[in-house]
Amino acid sequence: MAHHHDHEHDHNHDERELITLVDDQGNETLFEILLTIDGQEEFGKNYVLLIPASAEEDENGEVEIQAYSYIENENGTEGDLQPIPEDATAEWDMIEEVFNSFMEEE
């Protein structure tokens, strides 16, 4: 049974969820999972928003956020991250709406 996250849950900010991404050259970068979004009903996949684990805010108080779609494996512990196409307007609109709600709660 897969464990699906919903954007309406509380994050325990004392325990950071970390993930390692490996680029095409084999370089590993550690990221913190900022938010997971259940998009199964609308788009048939889930989404994750990541920030570099060592990220510091820039002069505007902002941190680079990366967004990916994924489909969890059967045991719900991992999945393959896929880039979200730039022209997937409905997906980006939903992600932005959920992210803005998440930030208002913080």
From Swiss-Prot:
Top-rank lineage group of the source organism: Bacteria
Family annotation (Pfam families): DUF1292 (PF06949)
InterPro entries tied to this protein: UPF0473
UniProt record similarity statement: Belongs to the UPF0473 family.
Name of the protein in question: UPF0473 protein SSU05_0068
